[in-house]
UniProtKB/Swiss-Prot annotation:
GO molecular function: enzyme binding; enzyme regulator activity; hydrolase activity, hydrolyzing O-glycosyl compounds
Signal peptide (from-to): 1-26
CDD domains xref list: PBP1_YraM_LppC_lipoprotein-like
Lipid attachment site numbers (N-palmitoyl cysteine): 27
Organism: Escherichia coli (strain K12)
Chain residue ranges for the region called Disordered: 302-339, 507-526
Name under which the protein is recorded: Penicillin-binding protein activator LpoA
Signal listed as a keyword: yes
Alphabetical list of InterPro entries matching this protein: LpoA, Lytic_TGlycosylase_superhlx_U, Peripla_BP_I, TPR-like_helical_dom_sf
Membrane association type: Lipid-anchor
């Protein structure tokens, strides 16, 4: 038998070994907290990974994974799931987790398009209390909450964010800073007040002034940018120029010595093609001059209404609109007398170039692919056209290397470095109307549209632009045929200022919104009004015959003191409106191309003479004239952000996809006269 003292000594010697084994065994099975690296932004994963880690963890580590999962879900567009998980967060959080939760609350509000809610939450956060990666997200949230509307606060947020970013993100930040600066009007820029120590912001504002002074002269702009870089060598924009200004420095004018004009010269669209050709050739041989932005129109002659011309689908509209959709249908027997221009004009013009070689190609006689091959063989330096939308879409599929000013635009715009899109469309007018109505301080618009695809497209375009400008819900109401309107007048029913909300479909991954809104049926009186408030603006898309019923029906139902201002597209404009019509339209504002609003009297008379006083065709003639100006400034429109031409169809600028936007003239019926809107 072994003595007990020996057993105790042996056990005592073995105990440290056993304890050590147990300790090391425990260390071997413990998983270190990996969430910290992800919380600090040094590692990233998707929501599925974070959710799996959350299920396998406990306590603070579990909360960290939960916060990371919420952030990933928001980034992946799974807002509903993110909100559900956010609401499951415990009340007890450490300081770091509490800061992350607050920032996530802001990002969820932004994902829900609750910009006011996001701004309220941002006001409660002190950026200095955040980690560096959180600060970058904080400033991005400030930027997103601004909805792209240029302001001094947006500029400060972009400037504060820039040092926190990597090289790729820095370029995006600098481009966004320049986008905010170049989106301002000169009047807005002049009202900005900054602090004495805001050196970076001062540098950006000086660059903005260089751009304002020289944007229509690429050579002067190049010199101005180079001088600015020397004066502000430490400005982030001097070290890494905005992409748009890099394009300016690389600017080379396009040649217009050999022009290919692609138009339909046979079939239903021939009248429009030949009219555009007339305007283009007149500008080529005579040149163009800047058009006055504001005019003062006198009353028109009292002439009977003329019959409407035949319409042709697919012409001069980005969304299968007929020419009648975008031009209005009332030919005039006599030009509308107007007074002299009231304001100064822009300096951009397109000189005549009779020696330029111009060749016309008939797109109605052979396939476009054959025409493009022939154009290339003929050595054309620029293509103007085609006019029909299906031809423009075929042009895109061809991947032509030629510079092209298309006279229409496809359903889905493609940004091509060699293509610009110029179209007269009701959608353009609707977007211009949204800007005009918003500028007049209106908050609750109703769009009154025909029951047709045209009406749907106009409603969608107006609502998109309205929300882009920071507006809320837009209402829409549809009307039927002229006979239905006449029956409404005879029945004394009138038109109530109520409508159904235009619900825009969700945006795609590329940020584009689908073309058609979700529309409801014609509303009754007890349906929605805008956010529970009274409609204060009505945008009407109607022919002269339709609006002659619509305006009295609005007054019949709502009285003259409804408080809503009425606006109309150029579709309602007729150059021969008699005194009774003008008095009936009292107070109505409507848009018109500057040429027909009196901004270019000589060309107006020339155009009306060429088209037998048909106002619809006169607009197409003006389009041909402006196409010459745009072709001569193709490189500027394509490369120089903010370049502007005071054209006959509108004040012409290009968006980043080189879609030519038109700002129209606005006129108003006042005591039997037609006057510019003040």
């Amino acid at each position: 038998m072994v003595p007990s003292t020996f057993s105790r000594l042996k056990a005592a010697r073995c105990l440290p070994v056993v304890l050590a084994a147990l300790i090391f065994a425990g260390c071997g099975t413990h998983t270190p907290d990996q969430s910290t690296a992800y919380m600090q932004g040094t590692a990233q994963a998707d929501s599925a990974f974070y959710l799996q880690q959350m299920q396998q963890s406990s306590d603070d580590t579990r909360i960290n994974w939960q916060l990371l999962a919420i952030r990933a879900l928001v980034k992946e567009g799974k807002t509903g799931q993110a909100v559900e998980l956010f609401n499951q967060l415990p009340q007890e959080l450490n300081d770091a987790q509490r800061r992350e939760k607050t920032l996530l609350a802001v990002e969820i509000k932004l994902a829900q398009k609750d910009f006011a809610g996001a701004q309220n939450l941002l006001a409660k956060i002190t950026p200095a209390d955040l980690e560096q990666n959180q600060q970058a997200r904080y400033w991005q949230a400030k930027i997103d909450a601004s909805q792209g509307r240029p302001s001094i606060d947006l500029l400060r947020a972009l400037i504060a964010q820039e040092p926190l970013l990597g090289a790729k993100e820095k370029q995006q930040n600098i481009d966004a800073t320049w986008q905010a600066l170049s989106s301002m009007t000169q009047e807005q820029a002049n009202t900005l007040v900054i602090n004495a120590d805001e050196n970076i912001l001062q540098g950006w504002l000086d660059l903005q002034r260089v751009w304002f002074d020289n944007r229509n002269d690429p050579d002067m702009m190049k010199a101005g940018i180079a001088d600015w870089q020397k004066r502000y060598p430490n400005n982030p924009g001097a070290k890494m120029l905005p992409t748009q200004l890099v394009n300016v420095k690389a600017f080379k004018p396009a040649s217009t010595n050999k022009i290919a004009l692609l138009l339909p010269l046979n079939g239903q669209a021939a009248v429009f093609g030949r009219t555009i050709q007339q305007g283009f050739e007149a500008a080529k041989n005579i040149g163009t001059q800047p058009v006055a932005a504001q005019v003062a129109a006198a009353p028109a002659a009292d002439v009977a209404e003329q019959p409407q011309p035949q319409t042709v689908d697919g012409v001069a509209s980005p969304a299968q609109a007929s020419v009648s959709d975008l031009t209005g249908e009332q030919p005039a027997a006599q030009p509308v007398p107007v007074s002299a221009p009231a304001t100064s004009t822009a300096a951009v013009s397109a000189p005549a170039n009779p020696s330029a070689e111009l060749k016309i190609y008939d797109t109605s006689s052979q396939p476009l692919s054959q025409i493009l091959s022939q154009v290339q063989q003929d050595g054309a330096s620029i293509v103007v056209g085609p006019l029909l939308k299906n031809n423009v879409e075929e042009l895109l599929k061809s991947n032509t290397p030629l510079n092209v000013l298309a006279l229409n635009q496809p359903e889905n715009i493609e940004n091509r470095v060699n293509i610009c899109y110029f179209a007269l469309s009701p959608e353009d007018e609707a977007r211009d109307a949204a800007r005009h109505i918003r500028d007049q301080g209106k908050q609750a618009p109703l769009v009154l549209i025909p029951r047709s695809s045209l009406g749907d497209r106009v409603a969608n375009a107006f609502a998109q632009e309205w929300q882009k400008l920071g507006g809320g819900t837009v209402l829409q109401q549809k009307f039927g045929s002229t006979s239905e309107l006449r029956a409404g007048v005879n029945g004394g029913s009138g038109i109530a200022l109520t409508g159904s909300p235009i619900t825009l479909r969700a945006t795609t991954d590329s940020g584009m919104t689908t073309n058609n809104p979700t529309l409801q049926t014609t509303p009754t009186d007890d349906q929605f009004t805008n956010n529970g408030g009274r409609v204060d603006a009505v945008y009407i898309v109607a022919t002269p015959g339709e609006i002659a019923f619509i305006k009295p029906m609005i007054a019949m139902r709502n009285g003259s003191q409804s408080g809503a201002t009425l606006y109309a597209s150029s579709r309602s404009a007729q150059g021969t409106a008699g005194p009774d019509f003008r008095l009936e339209m009292e107070g109505l504002q409507y848009s018109e191309i500057p040429m027909l609003a009196g901004g270019n009297l000589p060309l107006m008379q020339q155009a009306l003479s060429a088209v037998n006083n048909d106002y619809s065709l006169a607009r197409m003639y003006a389009m041909g004239v402006d196409a010459w100006s745009l072709a001569n400034h193709f490189s500027q429109m394509r490369q120089v952000q903010g370049f502007e031409i005071n054209g006959n169809t509108g004040s012409l600028t290009a968006n980043p996809d080189c879609v030519i936007n038109r700002n129209l003239s606005w006129l108003q019926y006042q005591q039997g006269q037609v006057v510019p809107v003040s």
